[in-house]
Amino acid sequence: MSNKRVVITGIGVVSPAGRKLDVFFDNVTSGKGFLKGIDRFDASGYPSKHAGIIEHLDAEEAFSMRMLKKLDRFSHIALLAADDAINDSGIDIKSEDKERIGIILGNALGGWAFAEEELRDLHRLGVREVSPYQATAWFPAAPQGQISINYGIKGFGKTIISDIASSHLAIDYAARAIKSGRADVVLAGGTEAPVSPYALLCCNTSGELSLTGSYKPFDRSRDGYVIGEGSAVLMVEEMERAKKRGARIYAEITGFGHTSDGTSPTGHDPEGKGIARAMKVAIDGAGIKPDDIHYILPAATGGINSDEGEARALGSLFGERLNASASIGVPKTLFGNLLGASGAVDAAIACLAMARGMAPVTMGCDDPDTRWKWSKEYGVAVFREIENVMINSIGRGGVNASLVLGRV
């Protein structure tokens, strides 16, 4: 692997908390909540029936209805986020060598809304009434493929399916593709649209969703997370190339750690040894010390064991210095856990936090567990200089990922 430095030069976010970056960041620092009862279909029989929902997607304003009707909502959302990331980066895709542009996206569930409708038609009306676009609309690689088709991208491509860690790994693969010389620029991120009957059922059967509709990680009465739909896509680029074209640089991708618990298909290690190793690998890879981390966006899935394990991992790595050296925030409590897109959304928040000197923290935690000593920062946005950010993901199957971004 070369010593090339890799940076983020464009951001696109489509979320329940907004799409335009200024609006999105203002919302996640204001404490405004975007979780609501699901009314897209009858969710009354589900144990968990709340979500972060994008009220007005308006994909037809940017893309033709002829194309959109062939795609699932998770592709619609990803197309918008990718378009925003490209525009934000200032890169003219048409003038680039498209064989040197990559695209790597993650998701956890695929396009279930489209698939469910076609399965209902199959059951009620028969095989002849199923959409001919079924085969290309639902499968997990559809957003990656459609974005590459839309912009003529012909370089390195990959779709990552690794539960909540999916977009974390997409960002890492993007950085590796650039360091290894396989691409000059890469669109990297994730997308998810889990607010459909079967997708919601799958999430409910995991046992990880909040039954109260409250997403309150590290709270004494935490009972899981609330899902959300959305996408975040980052333009990832080699640093010298970015500087040469006068690009705005949000952050450098400096470290990444990826481990497995090897313990349970659905549960999480309450000791947190796997995520602790991932964090250490990421920090060591960045060439810094734990004290140099100023802002932490934990996985914070709100489960009894998952939060316990992550809290122990943070304590083992940072010790008593944690509260003094770093702010800890879980802004996704406002708009939901975007599953396979959550890591990329957190990375977008981290970039904006470094640029603005403001760290969004955690809302909705009314009774923080006092065993963990960062409770003083719940419910407020912290103004501070931020040089390095650490972002964690913990997925089902014991997948752990930690990413470190540094200010340039």
Predicted regions span which residues?
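Short acidic, glycine/serine/threonine-rich loops at helix termini
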Residues: 18-19, 114-117, 171, 196-202, ...
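Conserved beta-ketoacyl condensing-enzyme motif
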Residues: 8, 23-25, 29-163, 191-199, ...
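ACP-dependent fatty acid/polyketide chain-elongation machinery
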Residues: 1-67, 89, 240-252, 348-363, ...
